[in-house]
């Protein structure tokens, strides 16, 4: 069966536009989720050289910029900041959930785990 090339192009355009719209909507939801963590006083403490911290941030993609994040190491020195010394942050990432008093040291948390601990709705 022969299909008109214009129909093929039209279908392709609709599919591409749907994918872009879906991605933008998902990104906005992930932005909201990251912001909610901050509102619920769930804070990630990390270090710029920490692979697991990068892995944690990567779960959020571009939305990582909205994560409540505290850098525990002064860049270029590897000296631990006073705030992180006071909180006894020894392994990163460390998540502290102020509202519940929970603390998880040295573990990458899934979005599901972050949702359960914080009360923020998953996107």
What is the role of each PLM region?
Residues 2-10:
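Bacterial N-terminal signal peptides that target proteins for export
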Residues 14-22:
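Hydrophobic h-region of N-terminal signal peptides that target proteins for export
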Residues 22, 26, 90, 103-106, ...:
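Catalytic phosphate/metal-binding cores of nucleic-acid and nucleotide-processing enzymes, i.e., regions
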Residues 26-68:
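Local sequence-structure signature of Cys/Sec-based thiol-disulfide redox active-site neighborhoods
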Residues 36, 74-83:
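Structural microenvironment flanking redox-active thiols in thiol-disulfide oxidoreductases
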Residues 48-52, 73-75, 90-91, 101-104, ...:
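Solvent-exposed loop/turn segments at secondary-structure junctions
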Residues 84-96:
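Structural micro-motif
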Residues 96-123:
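Non-catalytic, surface beta->alpha helical segment in thiol-disulfide oxidoreductase systems
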């Amino acid at each position: 069966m022969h299909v008109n090339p214009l129909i093929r192009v039209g279908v392709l355009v609709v599919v591409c536009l749907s994918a872009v719209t879906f991605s933008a909507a998902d990104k906005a939801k992930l932005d909201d989720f990251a912001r909610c963590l901050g509102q619920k006083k769930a804070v990630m403490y990390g270090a710029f050289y920490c692979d697991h911290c990068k892995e944690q941030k990567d779960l959020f993609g571009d939305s990582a910029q909205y994560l409540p994040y505290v850098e525990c190491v002064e860049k270029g020195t590897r000296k631990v900041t006073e705030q992180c010394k006071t909180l006894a942050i020894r392994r990163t990432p460390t998540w502290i959930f102020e509202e519940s008093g929970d603390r998880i040291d040295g573990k990458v948390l899934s979005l599901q785990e972050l949702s359960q601990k914080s009360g923020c709705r998953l996107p």
